[in-house]
Amino acid sequence: MAKKTKKTEEITKKFGDERRKALDDALKNIEKDFGKGAVMRLGERAEQKVQVMSSGSLALDIALGAGGYPKGRIIEIYGPESSGKTTVALHAVAQTQKEGGIAAFIDAEHALDPAYAAALGVNIDELLLSQPDSGEQGLEIAGKLIDSGAVDLVVVDSVAALVPRAEIDGDIGDSHVGLQARMMSQAMRKLSASINKTKTIAIFINQLREKVGIMFGNPETTPGGRALKFYASVRLDVRGNTQIKGTGDKKDQNVGKETKIKVVKNKVAPPFKEAFVEIMYGEGISQTGELVKIASDIGIIQKAGAWFSYNGEKIGQGSENAKKYLADHPEIFAEIDHKVRVHYGLIELDEDDVVEDTQVEDTSDELILDLDSTIEIEE
């Protein structure tokens, strides 16, 4: 019985060696035919962690889980009219340029306001803009920009406005069933590999439609078929909530609105998280407002009554004054923003953070030693 077992093990080992050799030969042939990296073991990849770029909103970065939009992935932003979809996308454009990248905007709706984009921090002199005549043209332009590998972000506004050429050439009233869905499906198949290879972020803004005859369930749907839903790594549902009233002379005016951004799909972090941001009319997302709220919630900014303080120093009475203080002191804003991101694990600890942690630990050890010596003296 023992001999039979030993013989079986030898056969298994020999068979395993033959399979391993056959696999190595196959990998060499594939690499020869298709290039290095065509097939590799997952653990051999140099970059296993998903690279991200900040969305331009701290609250949204936290909701996304990874700290921003994943590079080399497709993002869909949809919601009702005037909910803030384009504003969210323009903040991503501004953040890309801030980090030294190049952004392109495919304006299929022909409705981009340069003055508003500039107010959000977009460098309109450096922004690549295209206003295509048809859906195919817009997607072809996006594809060529992505294939170049020189563009970091491409925004398409919007999928619903990508009208197929056949529909433009036809008459109003002609039936074009499934034409836009087929166009988007083909585009996703062609663009997805190139987007991943060049590490370009592709943001598709989409509108909402309602299904006819739906009695139960959610009747809302997005145009352009299902391809974009499948290929998107992140889908954001943007909804405007309550209006924000002004202060002082503008106390009777609506100066902005609270907006809820829900991550309904996320392939790089847990989904279904929500971010609440203040979109101020003519200014975009209030970055100081969200920082004051988030930092005070986790104790980085201390709140006592109506007063806000940081590191023992008062920074304002009421949230509006605290926002103004942070806007006037960008170095304090950056310091608090960094601490919040470290708290939520969006960025790794730097040397300064490690030094601070070490000092805290040393202080606690000294306190324990003092207590022990006190006990010995009393005894």
From Swiss-Prot:
GO molecular function: ATP binding; ATP hydrolysis activity; ATP-dependent DNA damage sensor activity; damaged DNA binding; single-stranded DNA binding
Keywords tagged on the record: ATP-binding, Cytoplasm, DNA damage, DNA recombination, DNA repair, DNA-binding, Nucleotide-binding, SOS response
Xref: PROSITE patterns: RECA_1, RECA_2, RECA_3
Domain of life: Bacteria
Gene3D superfamilies in the cross-refs: P-loop containing nucleotide triphosphate hydrolases
Pfam families for this protein: RecA, RecA_C
Compartment(s): Cytoplasm
An example Gene Ontology CC term for this record: cytosol
One of the GO biological process terms: SOS response
Protein residues bound to ATP: G79, P80, E81, S82, S83, G84, K85, T86
SUPFAM superfamilies: P-loop containing nucleoside triphosphate hydrolases, RecA protein, C-terminal domain
Role this protein plays: Can catalyze the hydrolysis of ATP in the presence of single-stranded DNA, the ATP-dependent uptake of single-stranded DNA by duplex DNA, and the ATP-dependent hybridization of homologous single-stranded DNAs. It interacts with LexA causing its activation and leading to its autocatalytic cleavage.
Family designation: Belongs to the RecA family.
Annotated protein name in UniProt: Protein RecA
Organism in which the protein naturally occurs: Streptococcus thermophilus (strain ATCC BAA-491 / LMD-9)
Organism lineage: Bacteria, Bacillati, Bacillota, Bacilli, Lactobacillales
